A protein has these predicted regions:
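An acidic/histidine-cluster motif and surrounding catalytic segment
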Residues: 1-86, 93-126
């Protein structure tokens, strides 16, 4: 599924790493890197930023997904658990390529639109 998401974005040579964790594990990462002491559904750590950005040009970064949070949130999104995991993978990839939703409403709308379009495309093909 990750390869399919990347292909839909035209990133055929790109690589990501995916880590599936529980709420406690993602809370520790959220506190350490974003100073938010609570679990979240997905975290993205881009490799195209910082001192190691040129180390491996095809490596977009790391995506961490809390399976527990995904399960809890799936009903709110009208999805089954796998659908929610796919949505969070898309969300994480969009963050890795520069989309954001913090702050500006326009950025959040663009990201939500792109996320919805990608989700529809990749889930129609499976």
């Amino acid at each position: 599924m990750a390869r399919q998401i990347l292909a839909e974005l035209g990133l055929l040579d790109a690589e990501i790493s995916l880590l599936f964790v529980n709420d406690l594990q993602i809370q520790v990462l959220n506190q350490r890197y974003l100073l938010r002491d609570k679990p979240t559904n997905v975290l993205a750590f881009p490799m195209r930023e910082g001192e190691f950005s040129t180390l491996h040009p095809h490596l977009l970064g790391d995506i961490v997904i809390s399976v527990e949070t995904a399960k809890r949130q799936s009903n709110r999104f009208g999805l089954n658990e796998m659908g929610m995991i796919i949505l969070l993978m898309i969300h994480g990839v969009l963050h890795l390529i520069g989309f954001g939703h913090e702050g500006a409403k326009k950025g959040a709308r663009e990201m939500a639109t792109r996320q919805r379009e990608l989700f529809q495309r990749v889930t129609q093909e499976t």
